[in-house]
């Protein structure tokens, strides 16, 4: 007889493994037991005889031990050493949601969300129990101060120091996706502590765990994570039949249990195992928790009568059919068998009773016929079951698998009904930094509504400055335009030649034959399709291209004759080439003591009507001849006040008095207002200077970008505040260089070299919005522009070379890519509109130092990242830099669905009410201001909630209120009252569309009054008869018109 006890993997001495040795060990054990019984008998009296009898008498059940002394000895050992350690705990009381979700798409957002939810559930359950958490190989989201057993096996384990803390009495042992790798779970789970696991317990032999594929071969799970790693491991049978597990206590060196183990006596703990599968999207995931019940000692070389199971690995292989896996699942109301070949993705599930029936048939034809009769009609099921019946085990297809890429994160408005992210962007590599930009969801009306609230409504500015600043405005207008009433606009033909961009040419061609018609007063807004960290920027495009063409005859002439004149050359930068701007920046920085960078917050939205009329538009009216005043006044007034609606969704809104980004004046007049704030600051700081001398002291202006002298900072902030705007002046730091137009000049005192702002570039460099183009071609087109403008920029240039190397062999040819009209759409603006910025190869080290200083990453980390770019062969293998600064995101939700910053409940409710109101308003057809003979402006709403209908806006239904008036209910939207409904009840209203009247006597009998986005009452037709009118849509891609020349 050989003793199979092990002590740390070493067998007992040979002298004790012989027959004589076993006799000695048994004799010593009996002596020990007799001594214990004698002592016990003196203390417990008459009960001892009955207790001793229970050890010896076999009892009503069949005996396991063949020897009565051996049975008595084992029974006595168990009875005399048992100890009650029962605990009670139900962690599912802390379950918050059974279908968690992440907002960002990283390739495994579903399974990742479930793991996050499991971690939160476990943490909150332990906290509510009043106990401490002891985690095995904790992940990066675990607080470092928590107790843990931590080793460095995976790269992510390096987030904290190695540790092997002692398990305290008040601790719950936790393992999240790590129990598979334990060689012996008894090391942790044989203490008197409860434990809880988030583990993988598949119910099929292959398939998907949320959004992650897995197969099983040789009883090892092959778990392939898109956007993550590939893991292979066996699975412990936590969810097998058997309520109680027995685990042998781990021996401490020189402890009592250690000495007892020499005699084959071991301490055992019984854990009560419970499990649940609470997550709908990941049924293969289980939450397993163990509750300690009892402990006792046992003699390992004697039979044991206790009924409990021992933990083991799951065996998925089918013993009777080599090469096949078979698993029976009882999580539903009936047994379901899952079969599939080892390592293959193909698997089928069918009722276990049905599989038992078909396996007993004599021919394969009978198998197929019986399966069809049972209702299994899928060809995959029939073929696989027949192969299983025939015991056909074929070679596993060995091939490389391309992981599904992660998707760009999106901006989620707080007040929205969005379920799934919809964006037109794609990633073509992993992020360079962890805090990538967010992408707008252009197809959602809530996104536009959110941008309107945060960029128009909430920043509306009606402030009027002091009389002193008003006098400075009069001086400034005269300085910019020394000669009054001498200007003549360009002809329409000349303006048409100047508007030479493809979108501009197309728009002008569509209205050229009707250019003599009156201009329609209408703004159509949409969210700009660009990555951002907050609410997306709004493009307020003027719907009528006649306005843009006719107004451009004035703006182009004014820029050429006035703004580019010699007296304005020192401050006005639009229209210059990158080389000219770089030289201008260096000359200005060298000419002042300390430069200062001006950073306006929401410049367009915060411009007041006073600024528009007394500074921006005033320079036009002063220069042009009086005979053009009436026409010019008509155009400039539209910049301040004009009806507006959502271009895609149709709802009306109040555009405010701020700058309209689609106007041809945007860049020029923003520069004028920007420079005026500098002029007023100089006048206040140095009142002894003449107006002309103060004007010459102003810095550089390009739209809302500015570079100024630091000595005027205090008064500059004061002037901007008086105008109702916000300005942040960045202090000059030589280690960070100087920034102008998002270009960093590392040392403008010695070189005009510049490079793109690193973090601003890296956050969006791996994205493309050209969804209809193969991703390889879109990536190459995008990075080719950066390799011209930033040929020597650290990290940026190496990343672009890496993308070229990885995609060059699989992308289309350069000729094919250049044939697309949008091939230059994502290239840097300056490459298309002026050429490359100057960069010297010898300044690389200088740019590296400044890049490290601006981003906060050490140079060594950047060099390691560059080395990674140069060595990888797959752009998805790069590891992003971990950006530790506070989150740059605003007005959105994080990946857990929580707001990233504090939320005002009233503001949130107002935004939600506005979103619901605009949703209802957008469903109906909108009467839009126009002139007789103009185009019909009615546009059908797009991507709105509710089913599409050929009956127009029939889903907008009127519901009676108690007072007899109507309220409106929009499909899938909360009920809301129409604004102003009671004021127009019973009256017809004149439509502004051609002067036609809409009344109850028209052919459209049902009308409802709806409050538009601007709060005005309007009439919507609930049902129309007759054919629909065609939509005359004019292409309006004029948002870059202000960057002409």
Swiss-Prot record:
InterPro entries membership: DNA/RNA_pol_sf, Noda_Vmethyltr_dom, RNA-dir_pol_C
A UniProt-annotated Pfam family: Noda_Vmethyltr
Entries under CDD domains matching the protein: ps-ssRNAv_Nodaviridae_RdRp
RdRp catalytic domain location: 593-718
EC number annotated for this UniProt entry: 2.7.7.48
Function summary: RNA-dependent RNA polymerase which replicates the viral genome composed of 2 RNA segments, RNA1 and RNA2.
Official protein name in the record: RNA-directed RNA polymerase
Native source organism of the sequence: Macrobrachium rosenbergii nodavirus
């Amino acid at each position: 007889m050989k003793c199979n006890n092990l002590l740390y993997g070493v067998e007992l001495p040979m002298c004790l493994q012989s027959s004589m040795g076993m006799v000695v060990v048994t004799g010593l054990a009996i002596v020990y037991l007799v001594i214990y019984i004698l002592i016990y008998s003196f203390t417990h009296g008459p009960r001892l005889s009955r207790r001793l009898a229970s050890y010896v008498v076999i009892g009503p059940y069949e005996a396991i031990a063949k020897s009565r002394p051996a049975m008595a000895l084992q029974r006595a050992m168990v009875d005399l050493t048992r100890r009650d350690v029962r605990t009670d705990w139900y962690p599912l009381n802390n379950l918050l949601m059974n279908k968690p979700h992440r907002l960002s798409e990283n390739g495994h957002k579903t399974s990742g969300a479930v793991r996050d939810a499991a971690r939160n559930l476990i943490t909150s359950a332990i906290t509510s129990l009043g106990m401490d958490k002891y985690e095995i190989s904790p992940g990066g989201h675990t607080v470092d101060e928590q107790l843990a057993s931590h080793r460095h096996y995976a790269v992510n384990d390096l987030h904290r120091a190695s540790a092997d803390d002692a398990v305290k009495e008040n601790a719950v042992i936790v393992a999240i996706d790590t129990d598979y790798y334990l060689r012996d779970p008894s090391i942790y789970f044989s203490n008197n502590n409860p434990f809880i696991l988030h583990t993988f317990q598949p119910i099929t032999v292959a398939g998907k765990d949320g959004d992650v594929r897995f197969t099983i071969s040789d009883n090892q799970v092959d778990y392939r994570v898109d956007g993550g790693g590939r893991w292979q491991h066996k699975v412990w049978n936590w969810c097998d039949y058997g309520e109680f597990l027995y685990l042998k206590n781990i021996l401490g060196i020189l402890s009592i249990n250690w000495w007892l183990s020499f005699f084959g006596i071991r301490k055992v703990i019984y854990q009560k195992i419970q499990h649940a599968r609470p997550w709908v999207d990941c049924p293969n995931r289980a939450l397993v928790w163990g509750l300690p019940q009892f402990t006792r000692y046992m003699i390992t070389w004697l039979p044991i009568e206790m009924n409990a199971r021992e933990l083991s690995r799951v065996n998925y292989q089918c013993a009777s059919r080599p090469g096949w896996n078979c698993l029976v699942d009882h999580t539903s109301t009936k047994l379901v068998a899952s079969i599939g070949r080892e390592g293959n993705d193909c698997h089928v599930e069918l009722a276990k009773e049905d599989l038992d029936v078909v396996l007993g048939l004599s021919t394969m034809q009978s198998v197929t016929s019986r399966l069809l009769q049972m209702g299994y009609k899928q060809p995959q099921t029939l073929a696989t079951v027949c192969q299983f019946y025939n015991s056909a085990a074929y070679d596993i297809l060995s091939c490389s698998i391309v992981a599904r890429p992660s998707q760009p994160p999106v901006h989620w408005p707080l007040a929205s009904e969005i379920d799934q992210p919809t964006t037109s962007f794609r990633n073509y590599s992993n992020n360079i930094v962890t805090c990538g930009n967010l992408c707008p969801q252009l197809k959602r009306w809530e996104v536009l509504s959110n941008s309107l609230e945060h960029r128009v409504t909430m920043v509306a500015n009606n402030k009027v400055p002091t009389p002193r600043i008003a006098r400075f405005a009069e001086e400034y207008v005269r300085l910019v335009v020394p000669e009054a009433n001498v200007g003549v606009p360009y002809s329409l033909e000349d303006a048409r030649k100047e508007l030479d961009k493809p979108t501009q040419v197309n728009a002008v061609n569509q209205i050229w034959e009707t250019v003599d018609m009156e201009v329609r007063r209408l703004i159509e807004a949409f969210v700009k399709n660009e990555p951002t960290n907050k609410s997306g920027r709004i493009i307020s495009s003027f719907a009528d291209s006649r306005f843009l063409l006719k107004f451009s005859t004035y703006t182009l002439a004014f820029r050429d004759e006035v703004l580019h004149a010699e007296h304005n050359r020192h401050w006005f930068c639009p229209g210059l080439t990158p080389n000219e701007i770089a030289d201008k920046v260096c000359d200005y920085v060298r000419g002042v003591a300390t430069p200062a960078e001006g950073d306006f917050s929401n410049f367009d939205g915060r411009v007041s009507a006073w600024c528009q009329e007394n500074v921006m538009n005033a320079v036009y009216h002063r220069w042009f001849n009086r005979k053009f005043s009436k026409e010019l006044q008509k155009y400039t007034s539209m910049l301040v006040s004009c009806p507006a609606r959502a271009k895609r969704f149709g709802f009306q809104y109040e555009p405010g008095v701020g700058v309209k980004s689609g106007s041809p004046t945007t860049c020029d007049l923003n520069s004028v207002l920007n420079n005026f704030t500098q002029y007023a600051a100089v006048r206040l700081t140095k009142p002894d200077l003449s107006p002309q001398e103060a004007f010459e002291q102003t810095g550089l202006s390009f739209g809302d970008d500015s570079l100024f002298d630091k000595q005027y900072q205090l008064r500059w902030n004061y002037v901007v505040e008086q105008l109702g705007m916000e300005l942040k002046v960045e202090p000059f730091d030589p280690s960070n260089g100087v920034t102008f137009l998002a270009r960093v000049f590392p040392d403008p005192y010695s070189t005009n070299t510049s490079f793109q702002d690193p973090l601003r570039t890296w956050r969006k460099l791996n994205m493309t919005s050209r969804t209809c183009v193969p991703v390889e071609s879109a990536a190459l087109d995008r990075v080719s522009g950066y390799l011209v403008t930033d040929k020597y920029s650290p990290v940026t240039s190496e990343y672009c070379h890496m993308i070229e190397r990885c995609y060059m062999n699989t992308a289309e040819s350069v000729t094919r890519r250049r044939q697309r009209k949008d091939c230059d759409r994502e290239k840097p603006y300056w490459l298309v509109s002026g050429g490359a910025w100057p960069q010297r190869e010898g300044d690389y080290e200088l740019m590296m130092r400044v890049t490290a200083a601006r981003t906060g990453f050490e140079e060594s980390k950047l060099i390691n990242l560059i080395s990674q770019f140069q060595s990888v062969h797959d752009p998805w293998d790069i590891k992003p830099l971990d950006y530790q600064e506070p989150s740059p995101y605003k007005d959105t939700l994080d990946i857990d669905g929580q707001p990233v910053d504090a939320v005002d409940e009233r503001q949130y409710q107002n935004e939600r009410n506005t979103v619901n109101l605009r949703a209802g308003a957008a469903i109906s057809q909108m009467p839009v201001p126009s002139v007789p003979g103009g185009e019909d402006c009615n546009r059908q709403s797009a991507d709105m909630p509710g089913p599409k209908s050929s009956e127009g806006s029939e889903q907008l239904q009127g519901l009676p209120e108690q007072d007899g008036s109507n309220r409106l209910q929009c499909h899938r939207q909360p009920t809301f009252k129409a604004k102003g409904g009671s004021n127009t009840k019973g009256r017809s209203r004149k439509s502004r569309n051609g002067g036609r009247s809409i009344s109850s006597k028209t052919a459209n009998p049902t009308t409802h009054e709806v409050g538009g986005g601007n709060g005005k009452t309007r009439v919507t037709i609930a049902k129309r008869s007759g054919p629909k009118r065609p939509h005359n849509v004019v292409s309006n891609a004029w948002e870059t018109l202000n960057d002409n020349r």
